[in-house]
Amino acid sequence: MSAIVDIIGREVLDSRGNPTVECDVLLESGVMGRAAVPSGASTGSREAIELRDGDKSRYLGKGVLKAVEHINTEISEAIMGLDASEQAFLDRTLIELDGTENKGRLGANAMLAVSMAVAKAAAEEAGLPLYRYFGGSGAMQMPVPMMNIVNGGAHANNSLDIQEFMIMPVSQTSFREALRCGAEVFHALKKILSDKGMSTAVGDEGGFAPNFSSNEECLNTVVQAIEKAGYKAGEDVLLALDCAASEFYHEAEGVYSLEGEGLKLTSTQFADYLANLCDKFPIVSIEDGMAEGDWEGWKTLTDKLGKRVQLVGDDLFVTNTKILKEGIEKGIGNSILIKINQIGTLTETFAAIEMAKRAGYTAVISHRSGETEDSTIADIAVGTNAGQIKTGSLSRSDRISKYNQLLRIEEDLGDIATYPGKSTFYNLR
C-alpha cells in the first residue's frame, strides 16, 4: 500500500507574479509527488472557487495562505494514511470534506494541488511515467498543439477584442515536427512585426500583443507568417481563435461590443461575423464564440458552423460534467476545453473528458494564463488520448515546460507514438 505519511502545502508564485498553491505529498516508501496549480484571467462564472486571502496589505489581496493552511491542517488530517493509488476515493474524500457545490470552503486551488501531488507520488511509487499512470498501455497519441501566437482581449493591453489567435500544425507526422513548425512560424511572425515597426512584446501566454486595426488584419499577418516560414496555411497549418466572448458581451443590451472595430453586434450578427472570418481564413476551431450565458447565441453559432468548425466551450462548460451534459442535450458546441483548476480534482477532470468523447465532442487540454513550471497537463493530454493541447506560445518557460515534457513523452513512447494531425477533428466534415 502506498500510504500517505506527510502533506505540505506552500505559497509559491505563478507566471504573473501572483501567489498560487504548491503541494508535496510524501509516501511511506519515501517517494514524493509535487504539484503547483495555475490561475486564470478570463474566468467562467461557474468555475470552482479559487481561495484568495483578500488581505490588501499582502500581494494586493491575492495571497493563498488560507488555502495552504487548509492543506496543512484539515486536508492533511483527512487523507493521512490513505492509499495514494486510490485516486477516485481520495478525490471524493476531498469533495466531501469541502462540502460545497463550488469548492468554495477549502478552495479548488488547495484541493487540486493535493489531487495532482497524490497522483504524481502514486505514479512514482508504481515506477511509471505520469502519462502511463493516467492512461495505461493505451496512451500513445500525442496532442496537436493550439499555439497562441497573438494575444488580445484580457491577455494583452492592445486594441484586439478577440483574446487569442492560434496556429495548429496538422500536416506533420510527429509532435516534434509540429513543434518545430510552430516555432518557425512564431519567429517569422516576430520578423514581420519588427519590420512593420510593431511591438514584439509578449502577453501573458507568450504570444505577441501588437496593435492591429482589426481581427482580419491580424489573421492576414498570421497567414503571412505561416507562408514566410515555408508552410501552407490551410494545408500544413490551420488557424484557431479564442474569442472569450463573455468579456465583451453586454447582457443588458444583448450585444457583443467589438470596441477595436467599433461594432455592436447581436448574437446572430456575431455568428455571421465569425462565419465570415471562417470563409476568408482556414479557421478550424473557435473557443467561446458566444458568451457563457448566451445559450441561444451558442445554438445559433452551432447550427451555423458546428459541422465544419470545432466550437469549444470554455467559460461555457467550465470542465463541469453537469453543465456539459446539458450542453450535449441541447446541441450546444461540439468540443470542451479542459482546465483542471476549473473543477478542482483529477477524477472530475477525467470524467469531463470521458463524457465529451462518448458524446462525440472533442476535448482540448488547456493551461491557464497564470501558469507555473508544473507540466502535468502534458501528461494528461497523452494519458487520456485527448488529441489536442492548448498551452500558449513558443516563448516563456511556463509555456515551454509543457512542450518540452511532450517531447520527452514522445521520445519515451518511441515507435508507438502517433500524431493525429487533421484527424484530431474527428467530429467535423
Curated annotation (Swiss-Prot):
The active site is at E205 (proton donor), K339 (proton acceptor). (2R)-2-phosphoglycerate binds at Q163, K339, R368, S369, K390. The keyword Cytoplasm applies. It comes from the Bacteria. It is found in: Cytoplasm; Secreted; Cell surface. One of its GO terms (biological process) is glycolytic process. GO terms for molecular function: magnesium ion binding; phosphopyruvate hydratase activity. Keywords: Cytoplasm, Glycolysis, Lyase, Magnesium, Metal-binding, Secreted. PROSITE patterns: ENOLASE. Pathway: Carbohydrate degradation; glycolysis; pyruvate from D-glyceraldehyde 3-phosphate: step 4/5. Its EC number is 4.2.1.11. Catalyzes the reversible conversion of 2-phosphoglycerate (2-PG) into phosphoenolpyruvate (PEP). It is essential for the degradation of carbohydrates via glycolysis. SMART domains: Enolase_C (SM01192), Enolase_N (SM01193). This is Enolase 1. Belongs to the enolase family. Its cofactor is Mg(2+). Mg(2+) binds at D242, E287, D314.
